[in-house]
Amino acid sequence: VTPIRPFLDHTPQLGARVYIDPACTIIGQVRLGDDVSVWPGTVIRGDVNHVQIGARSNVQDGTIIHVSHHSPFNKAGYPTLIGEDVTVGHGTILHACTIEDLCLIGMGACVLDGATIKRYGFVGAGAVVGPGKVVGEAELWLGNPARLARTLSDREIESLHYSAQHYVRLKDQYLGVSSGS
């Protein structure tokens, strides 16, 4: 079974130098930017709406990414939109949400329908960001339900850049190419 599968007339679209582990599943209306990495056990399902993942983002082991359909309660449904240089930690659930550039979603976190994580947003491990919530720029949210804990330091913001760059180098090792970084 191939990890990349069409759904109806939609086939996942892949940018350059993308790494997709053979033990994951990517279905339907999914677009991966250049240098994206998708690690073992991840499921990205773009069946009833679309998923977009920006350049240099990494989706770590066991993550589930899905979308919501249009309904009488939500006319358009919600896609899942992930910006550039985003780190999605192991075992995360992203459902019909928006993650802007240079964010980190901690291991085991859950971000639900219509929620938005602004640039440099950091969702701590195990946190649950409820439907429609907005994590502001450079904010750390923790807990279940997730709440604002504090603003990130400059050093923590630097670590978000580092995390994305590290995963580009790592996926290049898996692909057997030089990243030039």
Residue ranges of predicted features:
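Thr-Gly-centered strand-to-loop micro-motif
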Residues: 21, 46-47
